[in-house]
Amino acid sequence: EHPVWVKAWYLNPETFKSAPLFLLSTDLPENDYVSQTITHRLYDANVATKVAQFILLGVGGAKLMDELNFNPGLYHLNEAHGISAAFYLDKKYGNKEEVKKRLVFTTHTPEEAGKEKHDIQKKKKMGYFCGMKLDEVRELTGMAGDQFNHSLVALRFAKLANGVSQLHGEVSRNLWKKFEGICEIKAITNAQNWHYWADKQLY
């Protein structure tokens, strides 16, 4: 565990008539070589790199909002890769219920095998939990074993989750119903019809 410097790139909405976009990079001379490579590949197969990317996405993204003096009423996690943000927000707000008021989660992967799980000790060693003790992490998340299940933790931290179609919502509810303490999983259909979602400037 050591500090990693992060640079935020900003894409102005006027460039492509899009929403504002922030991109995070660790490829900076202030970082050692290993830290510089955290953002070199998307979905890196190396577990330590992947955990570092998840810290950057979740904790880094939430910290960026604070650095920019934004005060989001809601944090939306599109898949569970950024759930480390919940531990940053727990530290910021002081309790899980305050985090739950501000967190929603979209789940995509309907297969149990596709849910990310990593060694909880490794995550603790890498600073994933923002300095929280492991027994506190276990109590907060309900994770009793050695494997940290990102999607399950996201479902326990969020006030609401959604699947990406009616059928997927049903499949997701069946997949997770055996677990205690999860939020409601609704369904929002991903629309591909431009009449529903595209800005007029795009067509």
Where are the regions that the model predicts?
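Catalytic cores of carbohydrate-active enzymes across secretory and cytosolic contexts
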Residues: E1-Y203
